[in-house]
A protein has these predicted regions:
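C-terminal and inter-domain tail/linker signature
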Residues: 1-128
Length: 128
């Protein structure tokens, strides 16, 4: 399985909330950083943080790029039975066929700030 396929598999297992399958993608001493909240996890902590996250969600991969041993993904995470959604941009660095380092950047989806709406700066991405 190439790096891109591994990231697709990881997101698929995350979407299914198959927590016992997540470890196989990571090196034993992998580091996972959630940069927005200044948190660093090992694999066990990463799985626990995700498995204990409240609610049920769906994950859709919107973009995937691969540059040598680096895979960059953009996913949309939507909480089922709720209007809440997020986007995550993730940088997966591989070593010896496993994820060695993962840096993730999360953002809440929402409408534009009122000051930009008032000034009529920009328009919705899906305006057609």
């Amino acid at each position: 399985m190439n790096y891109k396929e591994q990231v697709i598999g990881l997101w698929s297992d995350m979407n299914k909330q198959s927590w016992n399958d997540i470890h196989r993608y990571f090196d034993n001493d992998a580091v996972i950083n959630w940069n927005n909240t200044n948190e660093r996890f090992n694999v066990e902590e990463f799985v626990r943080a995700n498995s204990e996250y409240p609610g049920d969600w769906s994950i859709k991969v919107e973009r995937l790029e691969c540059i040598e041993n680096l895979v960059i993904s953009v996913v949309k995470v939507h909480l089922k039975n709720d209007d809440v959604s997020f986007h995550a941009t993730s940088f997966f660095e591989f070593n010896n066929g496993k994820i060695k380092l993962l840096n993730e950047y999360w953002g809440d989806d929402g409408k534009s700030p009122q000051w930009r709406i008032d000034k009529q700066i920009g328009k919705p991405i899906n305006y057609i």
